[in-house]
From Swiss-Prot:
Protein name: Protein translocase subunit SecA 1
Subcellular location(s) per record: Cell membrane; Cytoplasm
Gene source species: Mycobacterium sp. (strain JLS)
Quaternary assembly: Monomer and homodimer. Part of the essential Sec protein translocation apparatus which comprises SecA, SecYEG and auxiliary proteins SecDF. Other proteins may also be involved.
Membrane topology of this protein: Peripheral membrane protein
E.C. number: 7.4.2.8
Recorded catalytic activity of this chain's protein: ATP + H2O + cellular proteinSide 1 = ADP + phosphate + cellular proteinSide 2
Cellular component terms per the entry's GO annotation: cell envelope Sec protein transport complex; cytosol; plasma membrane
Gene that this polypeptide is encoded by: secA1
Amino acid sequence: MLDKLLRLGEGRMVKRLKKVADYVNTLSDDVEKLSDAELRAKTDEFRKRIDGGEDLDDLLPEAFAVAREAAWRVLSQRHFDVQVMGGAALHFGNVAEMKTGEGKTLTCVLPAYLNALSGKGVHVVTVNDYLAKRDAEWMGRVHRFLGLDVGVILSGLTPDERRAAYHADITYGTNNEFGFDYLRDNMAHRLEDRVQRGHNFAVVDEVDSILIDEARTPLIISGPADAASNWYSEFARLAPLMEKDVHYEVDLRKRTVGVHEVGVEFVEDQLGIENLYEAANSPLVSYLNNALKAKELFQRDKDYIVRNGEVLIVDEFTGRVLLGRRYNEGMHQAIEAKEHVEIKAENQTLATITLQNYFRLYDKLAGMTGTAQTEAAELHEIYKLGVVPIPTNRDMIRQDQTDLIYKTEEAKFIAVVDDVYERYEKGQPVLIGTTSVERSEYLSKQFTKRKIPHNVLNAKYHEQEANIIAEAGRLGAITVATNMAGRGTDIVLGGNVDFLADKRLREQGLDPIETPEEYEAAWESTLNQIKAEAEEEADDVRAVGGLYVLGTERHESRRIDNQLRGRSGRQGDPGESRFYLSLGDELMRRFNGATLEALLTRLNLPDDVPIEAKMVTRAIKSAQTQVEQQNFEVRKNVLKYDEVMNQQRKVIYEERRRILEGEDLAEQAHKMLVDVVTAYVNGATAEGYAEDWDLEQLWTALKQLYPVGIDYHDLVDSDAVGEAGELTREELLDMLIKDAERAYAERERELEELAGEGAMRQLERNVLLNVIDRKWREHLYEMDYLKEGIGLRAMAQRDPLVEYQREGYDMFVGMLEALKEESVGFLFNVTVEAAPPAPSNRVAPVAAPPGLSEFAAAAAKAQEQTGQGAVATKERETPAPTLRAKGIDNDDTPPLTYVGPGEDGTAEVQRSNGGPRHAAPGGATRRERREAARKQAKTSKPTRRRG
């Protein structure tokens, strides 16, 4: 029903877009008459009009006409009307559903150019580094021709290179790179260390893959937490002793394990504990679950391999060994324990955000894909994105044959090889889609036996994938590919002309970035030569039926099946597709496999005779719909839990931004001082009369905070108050606040004598930034711990999400109170010394970042220069003093670990060498780590100054 409601306005939107395209066409004649210089000058003209108040929507027809003409002159490619319609849909903040081969990459040029004119930046998001680099070079030629800067964000770039790329008018990159840069910016200790400049407009290529498939895995930056626990090994010993369906049950569909009461008793007996689920033992539940998952759900040589004593993850879809990546939440350690290899330490979360919440930061979001209709409801519900199906430039004449279902996998693959051999004999190109590297290698062996030449895409490098895919439409080409491999490159009958022309020019030593003038000069003649060769071959391919797409298994998502089919029949070309299935396929086993097997048994058909039945097709569609719904629920659940963190993250990141931008924090520091003293007094005077108050204990606590100038004995005995019973809470609080303000003013004078005027403001920034970061990390750790055990609340008939929201809020409020107390203590008690100012224009070394106080000093200097929140100081030409606060700075730089979604949506892990300065406290279990963290917090609390 929701799908139908969402599609009600589609027709009206398409008509509106058609009118836009028609209007752009009326401007084409005038634009074509312009010289190259005049066309380029249009960019400056548009910018002036925007500065004058003209709206981007009003500029759209002219800007699109200019960009279309530039693409024709630079790439010899002119946008079709449907591409102009797609570009307009993107500008209006929609998902443009454009079939494979309709030119989504070229379509993106139009809205990217228009929105870049505002000067606020445009981000074009792709699924991998190769596509980001390719599109930045390829489409960047058009933008550079029109006078715009184009940047690309790739893994491995330095911060300076990233900053330059973000300050370009249009920036290409992957979702993970954009997201991690956002998180790193909010861990930076100097304003100039940030690289992004805002979130204006993003166009997401393959939007279904990025916003849906990959949205189950949040982006996480983490650092080392502790040494590995011996509990992993202990539970790895217990797991083989436990029996499936006796001690525990396994749900393959949801990839979960559930421990029965018998299993709990078994573990309790083995460990010699009375109650596994009591608070002191609750961390052990996580070790048990991970050990059982490692045993039942993670298979060696399928999900991972063991090489040189190390557990390496294998990408199920592409078959790549994911070097340097690890499962999170203790899962990787559980597998290491199972395989008896070295167990490496867990990581502690330092910063995290979901892709859903990252992309909702943008003022305007748009996306392109060939297959979005099946997820229109989710895109609307989570991102408020409408899906607009763009008509094809030419009618699609591909023939989609019905599925063939075999009883066994062996019979299925024999039939596949026979079918491919027949097609190869007549020269028809074939693309065979598999769901895993294991099956693609098996098929490759069968083809080799039959002497069928072929290419296999178990690619380790996207560039090699693209090379093979670009030639997969040539006469007699047989290509075996996993479903996710080679996306972003068209399979063009006769070969991809642009790709082949670029390849030939690069072979001649020409490059669009390194040698742009020579590259452009040779482009047109090379392109024409390739075109003639390819068109002749394309006619031969059309004569034998076009590209034949053969799927060897249904994917759990209909969208992936449609993507595979969509490889064939582009731009009105002939084509054909068919899926070969068996009862041994993963999807069939998970849903209704037994029913179908019983049916085939009753029919008494031989193994090599397939069936074609609507009932089977319906069963498959039902199974896929169920999986899609389950995955949607997982993504919604991830978002609901992250929404709690998102509100808290906004508060912390906004506070950090204010500090980095040099805002005067004197008023905030004063408020914190008053709040902390008030909290101390409230705690001491909460119950009873004045004579019952333990003023000695209150004074002891206050002396740990600041140098108290009042003796409570004098206070009680003074004539002003009289007897102790006459002392009111308000009088006590008023006296102590005035005393604390006196002490703070004295502290400020001391620092100014030591390091000059403005020194206290500098220390406030230094301390606040340090304490916020440390408390936020501790809070993330506590929230991780809370979320890990919150599911158990369901056993008490409580909604885990509601409990998480309530307790998470309470913990956040508690963290803010602790932040105030610790900040005030440091401001009074930290030992400060003046350091000589750094020479101007000095370049900081890359390997070792300066201490926190130097960071704050730099921020203070920047603040003085900009005049924002300036402190009243005497004019002077000498450099601002630099403070060094002992006990705050810590120059340790443990390696950072980045966890984000891979192209198939599963978590992937990467490491770097630099990181934040504070590692988490050590300990064997999470509970032990918490205790260690608390002890460390206590010992690191500031003590009273002496002297």
